C-alpha cells in the first residue's frame, strides 16, 4: 500500500516575513493520518487553525494567502511546494505571524527542515486526486490547464521581456517520473525587479526582501553577485510556486498541468474549477505500490526526491 506521510519529530526555525520584515517563528509538528496540512496562528489570543484547501485561499495578489475567521497566513506556496515534493500528507504548521518566513526565497530551506525532522510513513492509504477530464481557466492571454495523466508533470511558460530572462529560457517541462524535485526545482528562488521592490516598499510591502532571499534584476542584468543557482532559475521558480499552489487542494494530483503566464490567482481558480465539476476527477489510492505512478512509488524515499 502506498501510505500517507508525516514527519517524525517537531522541528523549528526562525526567519523574516518578506513583506513585514519582522521575525517569524515556524514550528512543524507531526499530524495523524487524514489530518492534511494545517496552519495555525499561535500568536493570536485564541489560536486559529486554518487547514490548507483551495476554498480557503482568499488573496492571491502577491502570494497565496489562507484566510479563516479573520485570521490570515500568507506566502504559503514555498512551504506547500516542499510538502508536495517530499510527499508530506499530514502536518501541523505553527506560525507566530501572518506570514510564513521567506527564508532564502526558495523551497530549499523547507525541504531541509522536513528532511531533518525525518519522514514517517503512516498506516493509512495515500489519497490522490486523479483528473479524469480536461479543465482549463483563461484570463486574457494567460491560461492554466489540467489534463488526465497517470503521474504528475508540469509545463510552464513565462513571458518576461528582460535580457537576463530571455537568455535563461522562458519555458520548462518536467515529469516527476524522471526528475528530482529536491535537486532540480526546490532551490529556485523568487525574483523581482529593483524598481518594483522600491514601489512595494513605498506601499509598506517587501520590507524583508533582499538579495539574500530573491534574485533582483535591474533593466539589463542580475544584481546578485552569486548569479543563478540553475540556468533556468526564473521559470523553475514559477513551477515551484505552481506545485505549491496546486497542493492546497489537499492531495497530490495525478494530472498534466500546462500554464502560460499563470500565477497564484489563476492556479487557485483552476483548482476551484476542477472541484466544481465532480465528473472531472476521482479520489484514488494504491494498494500495490508497484501500480502507483513512477515518482510516487517509493517505499521509504521521498515523493519526487
From Swiss-Prot:
It catalyses: a UDP-3-O-[(3R)-3-hydroxyacyl]-N-acetyl-alpha-D-glucosamine + H2O = a UDP-3-O-[(3R)-3-hydroxyacyl]-alpha-D-glucosamine + acetate. It holds the Pfam family LpxC. Its cofactor is Zn(2+). The active site is at 264 (proton donor). SUPFAM superfamilies: Ribosomal protein S5 domain 2-like (SSF54211). GO terms for biological process: lipid A biosynthetic process. Belongs to the LpxC family. NCBIfam families: lpxC (TIGR00325). Catalyzes the hydrolysis of UDP-3-O-myristoyl-N-acetylglucosamine to form UDP-3-O-myristoylglucosamine and acetate, the committed step in lipid A biosynthesis. This is UDP-3-O-acyl-N-acetylglucosamine deacetylase. It comes from Paraburkholderia phytofirmans (strain DSM 17436 / LMG 22146 / PsJN) (Burkholderia phytofirmans).
Amino acid at each position: 500500500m502506498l501510505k500517507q506521510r508525516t514527519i517524525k519529530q517537531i522541528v523549528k526555525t526562525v526567519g523574516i516575513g518578506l513583506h513585514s520584515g519582522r521575525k517569524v517563528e515556524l514550528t512543524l509538528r507531526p499530524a495523524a493520518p487524514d489530518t492534511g496540512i494545517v496552519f495555525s496562528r499561535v500568536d493570536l489570543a485564541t489560536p486559529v487553525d486554518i487547514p490548507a484547501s483551495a476554498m480557503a485561499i482568499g488573496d492571491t495578489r502577491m502570494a497565496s494567502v489562507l484566510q479563516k475567521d479573520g485570521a490570515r497566513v500568507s506566502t504559503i506556496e514555498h512551504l506547500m511546494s516542499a510538502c508536495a515534493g517530499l510527499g508530506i500528507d499530514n502536518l501541523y504548521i505553527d506560525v507566530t505571524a501572518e506570514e510564513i518566513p521567506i527564508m532564502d526565497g526558495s523551497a530549499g530551506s523547507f525541504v531541509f527542515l522536513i528532511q531533518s525532522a525525518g519522514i514517517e510513513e503512516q498506516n493509512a492509504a495515500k489519497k490522490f486526486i486523479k483528473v479524469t477530464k480536461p479543465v482549463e481557466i483563461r484570463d486574457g492571454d494567460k491560461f492554466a490547464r489540467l489534463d488526465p495523466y497517470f503521474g504528475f508533470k508540469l509545463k510552464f511558460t513565462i513571458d518576461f521581456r528582460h535580457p537576463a530572462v530571455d537568455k535563461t529560457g522562458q519555458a520548462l517541462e518536467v515529469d516527476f517520473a524522471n526528475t528530482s524535485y529536491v535537486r532540480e526545482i526546490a532551490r529556485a528562488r523568487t525574483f523581482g525587479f529593483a524598481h518594483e521592490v522600491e514601489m512595494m516598499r513605498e506601499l509598506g510591502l517587501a520590507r524583508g526582501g533582499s538579495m539574500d532571499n530573491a534574485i533582483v534584476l535591474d533593466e539589463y542584468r542580475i544584481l546578485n553577485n552569486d548569479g543563478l543557482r540553475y540556468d533556468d532559475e526564473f521559470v523553475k521558480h514559477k513551477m515551484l510556486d505552481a506545485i505549491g499552489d496546486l497542493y492546497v487542494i489537499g492531495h497530490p494530483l495525478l494530472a498534466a498541468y500546462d500554464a502560460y503566464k499563470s500565477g497564484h490567482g489563476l492556479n487557485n481558480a483552476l483548482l476551484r474549477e476542477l472541484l466544481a465539476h465532480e465528473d472531472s476527477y476521482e479520489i484514488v489510492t494504491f494498494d500495490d505500490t508497484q501500480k502507483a505512478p513512477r515518482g510516487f512509488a517509493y517505499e521509504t524515499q521521498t515523493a519526487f526526491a
